[in-house]
Amino acid sequence: MRQQQAGGVGDGVSPGNVPVCYYGPGGRVPSSLERRARAAEVLLRCAACGLAVLAAALLGADRQTRVFFSIQKVARYTDMQSLVLLVIANGMAACYSLIQCARCLVMAYIVISAVAAAMEAALIGKYGQPEFQWMKTCHLYKRFCAQAGGGVACAIAASVNMVGVALISAFNLFRLYGNSNGGGKATTTTMAGGK
């Protein structure tokens, strides 16, 4: 294996002919930037995990009983499939964050789609849909709707943190592979013996 200099002095190794760029003094990323990026990523991961657990707990424990004409009606999160999806997605995201600790966009997309579905159902519950003759129900189950709203708000915050983690992960990945004819220095490793 032979290492060639492509555009300057560098000491990175890449598989094949891919130029690897390091920016900063001495061809490296400044350690203060690296520490801040890692600290921000850990903070966002912990916040996303905590908020996902909180959202799943708030929604999973949400129930309210009302009496209508001597008939008891219980409102639970299982009455709306989008809230069930949101509880499952947040539970998965929390477990994934605790166990895997890998940089993956899939969980961010799952939680964002579950939040969108739950927000749609929450808005229908709050305002109804007169075109389809769906009546609003939040004036009947105020505590249930308030707790569900808190769970959805925590899920939104968790998804924002997951997107932040995904952005930091993407930055860490793509900063290594840049334009070798630009200002950055690149080192190329080739498997072949020729120039």
From Swiss-Prot:
Xref: Pfam families: CASP_dom
Superkingdom, taxonomy of origin: Eukaryota
Record bears the keyword Membrane: yes
Intervals, Cytoplasmic compartment: 1-38, 103-104, 172-195
Cellular component aspect of the GO annotation: plasma membrane
Main location per the UniProt record: membrane
UniProt keyword annotation of Protein transport present: no
Keywords assigned: Cell membrane, Membrane, Transmembrane, Transmembrane helix
Annotated transmembrane regions: 39-59, 82-102, 105-125, 151-171
Membrane topology: Multi-pass membrane protein
Record localization: Cell membrane
Family the UniProt entry places it in: Belongs to the Casparian strip membrane proteins (CASP) family.
Subunit structure and binding partners: Homodimer and heterodimers.
Listed name of the protein: CASP-like protein Os03g0196400
Source species: Oryza sativa subsp. japonica
